[in-house]
From Swiss-Prot:
One of its GO terms (cellular component) is plasma membrane. It catalyses: nitrate(out) + ATP + H2O = nitrate(in) + ADP + phosphate + H(+). ATP binds at G39, A40, S41, G42, S43, G44, K45, S46. It is an enzyme of class 7 (translocase). It comes from Synechocystis sp. (strain ATCC 27184 / PCC 6803 / Kazusa). It is found in: Cell inner membrane. This is Nitrate import ATP-binding protein NrtD.
Length: 266
């Protein structure tokens, strides 16, 4: 899988004039990579993900998946949203099978595929439960299983853990690292949480705000990354390298905010 974003721009036109949400975005994601795009509010993170998902149309520029131009939603891109997007009247299994049913898969194929991915996310014993019976973290694991069940080439994640408490979020990070390494899937996740980006990603794109542009691209190399599988647990947050990357990204974001504040004041 190769995701290529070239000279991407998105301008919104309203009664009060034009707003440039994204300007000259160039990014790429290779097969099996975990990439994060981090930025503050107003950096166009969610707009970027919606464009890649085919839920919005760029003003100019191109998005290609394996050389095919994105012109709308497709099964080659899975999406996990920040807010729980499960159907409350369906069981966990039915939620995971939903996309497969739309694709015309047989009942046996739906059952087997859903069982596999529910096992991957550690929820096989909750197959017949309803979303109301699950915690927030469990709901997001179901959403991840549902997206993965359709075998997307890239999994798009829109701040999926933003509504979770810190302890649940940390557990979800380790679940996600394990899922990514077991399935060797490609993931693009957007977040405003700097430590989340450094902990999860192999590469991080730092976005500025108003308009959203790429300030910098960083390759993350933490102790244990040379191992197979990568040994990323929460002990890694004590390492000097983790602080270095987090501080560099935070400084970039703070620097941009300072420039904007000074511009408004003048």
């Amino acid at each position: 899988m190769h995701l290529e974003i070239t000279d991407l721009n998105r301008v919104f036109v309203g009664k009060r004039g034009s707003v440039v949400a994204l300007k000259n975005i160039n990014m790429h994601i290779e097969t099996g990579e975990f990439v994060c795009a981090v930025g503050a509010s107003g950096s166009g993170k969610s707009t970027l993900l919606r464009l890649i998902a085919g839920l919005d149309t760029p003003t100019s520029g191109t998005i290609n998946v394996d050389g095919q131009r994105v012109t709308g939603p497709g099964a080659d891109r899975g999406m996990v949203f920040q807010h729980y997007s499960l159907f409350p009247w369906m069981t966990v299994r039915q939620n995971v099978e939903f996309g497969l049913k739309l694709q015309g898969c047989s009942q046996k194929e739906r059952f087997d595929t859903a069982s596999y991915y529910l096992d991957v996310v550690g929820l096989i014993n909750f197959s017949e439960a309803y979303p109301r019976e699950l915690s927030g973290g469990m709901k997001q694991r179901v959403a991840i299983a549902r997206s993965l069940a359709c075998h997307p080439k890239v999994l798009l994640m829109d701040e999926p853990f933003g509504a979770l408490d810190i302890q649940t979020k940390e557990r979800m990070h380790e679940y996600l690292i394990d899922i990514w390494q077991r399935l060797q899937c490609s993931i693009l996740m957007i977040t405003h949480d700097v430590e989340e980006a450094v902990f999860l990603a192999q590469r991080v794109y730092v976005l500025s705000s108003r308009p959203g542009t790429i300030q910098r691209e960083l390759t993350i190399n933490l102790p244990g990354d040379e191992e197979t599988p990568k040994n990323r647990t929460y002990k890694i947050k004590r390492e000097p390298e983790f602080f270095k990357y987090s501080d560099e990204i935070s400084s970039l974001l703070r620097g941009r905010e300072t420039e904007e504040t000074e511009a408004i004041a003048s």
